[in-house]
C-alpha cells in the first residue's frame, strides 16, 4: 500500500486562513440618518414630559356696531409623556477563552473584541428594527404557521409583513397572541437557522400558533412586550396601531393622528399621482408643515424607478443629500423631498415624514455600564466575566399630523 493522506493523517497539518469574515448584513443607513437629523433631548429623571398647543383662543367673530364684544377664548394646551425604554445587551466570556483567543496565534480573532463588537452591532440593529419597523410593542414578525421545527412567518404579499427579515440566527424569541395581555405561547425558543425569507428553524414542539406575534426574548418567563423604543409604525399612525400615544388618546386628540392615504388593505400599484397626493396631504389636511423626507422599503423605490424610466418628465437621478447620503428626490410644488430606503422600513408603505417634529429623548447614550469604574464584572462565583452594553432612550414626536402615510402599495409592478 502506498503512503497517502490517509496513512499520514496524523502527520499533516491543516492550514487556516487568517481573520474572521462577517456574514451578517449590518447595513442600516436610515436609522443612522434618523439619529443624526432628529433633535436630541438629554435629561435626568424618570420620564420626559412636554407640552403642545392643540387649540387657538377662539374668542372672536363679526359683530354689528355697538354690539357686545365676543366672549374671550383660551389657548388649549396638553401635556404628553414619553417614558424611557431600557435596552441592554450582555457579553459573557470565561477566563480561559479570553486567554486562549487573545492573539492570532491561538484564534482567528480576539474573542473579547469579537463579542463586544457583536453586542454593539446587535444593539444598533435592534434600535433600527424597532425604530423603523416597530410600533413600540417589540413585535418583529407574525406567525403564518408552525410545523415540526419550521416556523413560517407572514410575508409578502400579506400587507405590512416582512417575513423572517427581522429575525436572526442565535436569537431567542417568544410568541404571544397579542401585543399586550394574554399568555405566552412559545417561551424563549432558540432560532438555529434562517433558511429563507419566510422561515426560521426552531425546536420541535416549540408551541408557536398561527397569527401569534413574535418578540425578541430576554429570558424564559420574562414578558418582553412594550419595553422597546417607539418606532415609525406607532408615530406615523392614525390610531389604527397605537391608540394611546405618549399618554394621550388619539381619538380625543386628533392632532396626534397622521394623515393616511390607504386602500382598505388591498394592495395597489405605485403611481406618481399617489406620490404627489401624499406629498401635499400634510399641507392640505394636516398641521401645515411639509414632510422633509420620504421613507420606504427598497422594493417600492425599485418599482418607482422601473415605472419612471420611460417617463422623462420625472427626475430619479441619484443625488448627494444632507450628511453625504446618496438617494433620489421627489419634486413637489413646495420643494424637493429626499427619498430614502431601508430594509427595515414598513412593507407596503411610503411614509412622508416631517423629521422636524421627531425627537430622541436620551437618558443614557450607548455605552458600557461602568458606574463603579469597571466594565467587566464577575458573576455567579465562576471564573467568567460579563460586560453590559446599554442605552436608555425613546423616540417621540411633538406632533403627528405633519406626517403622511401612503399605504397598501404593492412591492411588484
Q: Where do the language-model regions lie?
A:
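Core alpha/beta structural scaffold of self-assembling particle/tube/pore-forming proteins
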Residues: 1-57, 61, 73-413
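Short, charged, low-hydrophobicity "junction" segments
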Residues: 63-65
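Helix-start/capping segments and mature chain N-termini
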Residues: 67-72
